[in-house]
Amino acid sequence: MSKICEICGKGPSFGNNVSHANNKTSRIWYPNLQKIKAVKNGTVRSIKVCTRCIRSGHVTKAL
């Protein structure tokens, strides 16, 4: 199960948690993915899409 948007290809970002003592530990920020039924290439499929693609209308939800 990949954590990548099937429309825009947005995936995880990598960085560090930084404490007050300036200690750094690596961490990952995941995109807000939703599993929705959408029309893709004329067929209804269940796809993982980020909320930005849903809000901006890049995806048409199946009824």
Curated annotation (Swiss-Prot):
GO biological process: translation
Record's keyword terms, sorted: Ribonucleoprotein, Ribosomal protein
Superkingdom field: Bacteria
GO CC list: ribonucleoprotein complex; ribosome
Keyword Disulfide bond: no
Stored HAMAP family: Ribosomal_bL28
Protein name per Swiss-Prot or TrEMBL: Large ribosomal subunit protein bL28
UniProt source species: Geotalea uraniireducens (strain Rf4) (Geobacter uraniireducens)
